[in-house]
Amino acid sequence: MFEHLNSQPSDKIMELMAQYAEDTRTNKLDLGVGVYKNAEGATPIMKAVKKSEEILHRLQDSKSYVGLIGSIEFSKNIGGLVLNNSVDDKRLSFAQAPGGTGALHQLLLLARATKSVGNVWISNPSWPNHQAILKHLGINMSSYYYFDETTCEVNFDKMYNDLNDMRENDILLLHGCCHNPTGANLSLEQWVEITQLIQDKNVLPFIDLAYQGFGDGLAKDVEGLNYLVKNVSEAMIAVSCSKNFGVYRDRVGVAIVVS
């Protein structure tokens, strides 16, 4: 059976990581995968995470199932960090996910199950896995202009012009902050305009939030997201805890639905 499978192409980021590890130069700098490193090149466990693990080790008395949606207490606390009381708790649904990628996948499966999804609009450029997951799920996609390489900023006029072509029941995928790969973010005023366009077009906003706290701070980084979810009827948010909690290998994330 398996002899008929074709070998998958190697991951370019993983190839780059291997090359970096083999490089003997002392002045090398790793600009590959998005992992925090200190001055010594190590990725330490945060003190708060280590303390939490110690408490869990001491007090946890069961490994029994917690239900299909995972730890609701954990998910609600992450929701509080992300949403800052911008929407009524009654409008929120949560599910623990295996990282931000798992949350993204779960929410796209949920949207696909409605059988009413049109195109999913992703920025050009965007995180490569966005396109890969959409293709794997058989969901149609369109792209919108985002980054101006001359000014190194968002070209909002071109972005807005492209998004004017969205149709009812399309999904607009936005980066919550620290846009990957450009680092260029929408201003709060631009979030307001995009929110109005979402309302006018009756499309579903989908926020990929992987870097909260790495831009202008935990609260500032989600101001635009908070405004948006407060002013739309429905939204989806995929949250990654890999970066801001430094728990990359533990695959920690949350899928949030606002309805």
What are these model-derived regions, one by one?
Residues 37-41, 181-182, 246-247:
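Short catalytic/ligand-binding loop motif for oxyanion handling, primarily in non-cytosolic enzymes
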Residues 223-259:
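Active-site PLP attachment segment
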Residues 209-210:
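Conserved Walker B
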